[in-house]
Amino acid sequence: MTTFYTVMSWLLVFGYWLLIAGVTLRILMKRRAVPSAMAWLLIIYILPLVGIIAYLSLGELHLGKRRAERARTMWPSTARWLNDLKSSHHIFAKENSDVAQALFQLCEKRQGIAGVKGNQLQLLTSTDETLSTLVRDIELARHNIEMVFYIWQPGGHADDVAEALMAAARRGVHCRLLLDSAGSVTFFRSPWPAMMRNAGVDVVEALRVSLLRVFLRRMDLRQHRKVVLIDNYIAYTGSMNLVDPRFFKQNAGVGQWVDLMARMEGPVATTMGIIYSCDWEIETGRRILPPPPDDNVMPFEQESGHTIQVIASGPGFPEDMIHQALLTAVYSAREQLIMTTPYLVPSDDLLHAICTAAYRGVEVSIIVPRHIDSMLVRWASRAFFGELLAAGVKIYQFEGGLLHSKSILVDGQLSLVGTVNLDMRSLWLNFEITLVIDDDGFGSDLARVQEDYIARSRLVDAKRWAHRAYWQRIVERLFYFFSPLL
């Protein structure tokens, strides 16, 4: 009997180490950033069983077998649609400014489609203004409305949007609503989904969370886009979820969320429409390719129109696209670079690009909220302050609420606005969308918004930061090790 237990003990030990060795080899064989690999190995060696379970469920990009197959089968029809769209030569920009040229070339090469011109663009900085404008557009919709959001939180003006959407469906407008399962959990537990479906709205719960599927698909892979499309002509995107800040996370102690949205009219709605159709088909298996731009309603020839490129990221889209775009934008800066983000946990490459820009004389400013809703990200973000400050980067901590805007302005000409945070999830994991605008007029509008943020912020003093408490440095470094996983 003693021999039996001895043999079993040795077999368990051997199996235990074999499992660790197998997972270690899998991590090393996967093509990933070195800091990310090291962070996973550290977790597995410190907390072996917990680390292995965490890695198998969260460490690799699993879209799920069914969704991955849909993504594969949809591509031929999507590619044909893109080729057909290229015949509409008059909607594509042939020239870009010097600062935007490299980024637009990158996007066209990687995504197969150039930036589109002739768009009207409005920057919305107030949630009330955004929701009231959206309600008005929904009330005037004639054919179709497509929406995707990470969070839809019932209450306040969000209910006005829901009522307008149901009214549109009742009068015959085809309404589709795609919401992330985790982000919109409160919505899906409310009466609103049933009410909307009864009114004729096609409501879909994206990337449904289930413990039974934890090893089949990454549970932290989320649908993070915020997009509204109306009649293949009007489009919205930006940082704002479908929430009324007065009713959203009031107990978090961070104040009301401050967001930025862009409302567009023009052919960019068509290019955003193909992104939505991909998301819809991956989730439902149903194909809804958008129609080509209507020459009778598109303001192609207006000299005041904006040139816009749309960048989509996430599983099924060009790998590492948004990360490459951000690096290109930063390296294109010659005079000024202003960035706003709620979560500052950049990759090593992006961190070095920002610091290098400051070293070569670019005036670099980063605006982040002083208080955020994640303790882990707050401490991890602080770990990057020292290197940024040493390079001469100005860091502003916004004190007027939780600054949730995601924007970049390069030399007053090149603007990036969308859903992407400067963290690992946005850069390499989630479904995201970013607008790239080559226009100094829009750049001036964005600069005014960023200047308002700075006016409501406190500049981090480099000397005082260097003398912060030692225990704070220890906590920052601890979370820094895990920053590739945040």
From Swiss-Prot:
Q: Which GO terms describe its cellular component?
A: plasma membrane
UniProt-listed Gene3D superfamilies: Endonuclease Chain A (3.30.870.10)
The terms under GO molecular function for this entry are: cardiolipin synthase activity
* Membrane topology listed for this record: Multi-pass membrane protein
Q: Which CDD domains match?
A: PLDc_EcCLS_like_1, PLDc_EcCLS_like_2
Q: Where are the transmembrane segments?
A: 3-23, 38-58
| Biological process terms in GO annotation | cardiolipin biosynthetic process
Give the catalysed reaction(s), semicolon-separated: 2 a 1,2-diacyl-sn-glycero-3-phospho-(1'-sn-glycerol) = a cardiolipin + glycerol
User: In which domain of life is the source organism classified?
Assistant: Bacteria
Q: Which InterPro entries does the UniProt record give? A: Cardiolipin_synthase, CL_synthase_A, CLS_N, PLD-like_dom, PLipase_D/transphosphatidylase
Q: One Pfam family, please name it.
A: PLDc_2
* Domain PLD phosphodiesterase residues, every copy: 219-246, 399-426
Cellular location(s): Cell inner membrane
Where are the active-site residues found?
A: 224, 226, 231, 404, 406, 411
This enzyme's EC code(s): 2.7.8.-
Keywords, in A-Z order:
Cell inner membrane, Cell membrane, Lipid biosynthesis, Lipid metabolism, Membrane, Phospholipid biosynthesis, Phospholipid metabolism, Repeat, Transferase, Transmembrane, Transmembrane helix
Q: Does the keyword Manganese apply?
A: no
Concerning PANTHER family, the annotation shows: CARDIOLIPIN SYNTHASE, PHOSPHOLIPASE D
The record's similarity note reads: Belongs to the phospholipase D family. Cardiolipin synthase subfamily. ClsA sub-subfamily.
HAMAP family, per database record: Cardiolipin_synth_ClsA (MF_00190)
What function does the entry list?
Catalyzes the reversible phosphatidyl group transfer from one phosphatidylglycerol molecule to another to form cardiolipin (CL) (diphosphatidylglycerol) and glycerol.
The protein, known as: Cardiolipin synthase A
- Where does this protein come from, organism-wise? Erwinia tasmaniensis (strain DSM 17950 / CFBP 7177 / CIP 109463 / NCPPB 4357 / Et1/99)
Report the gene name: clsA
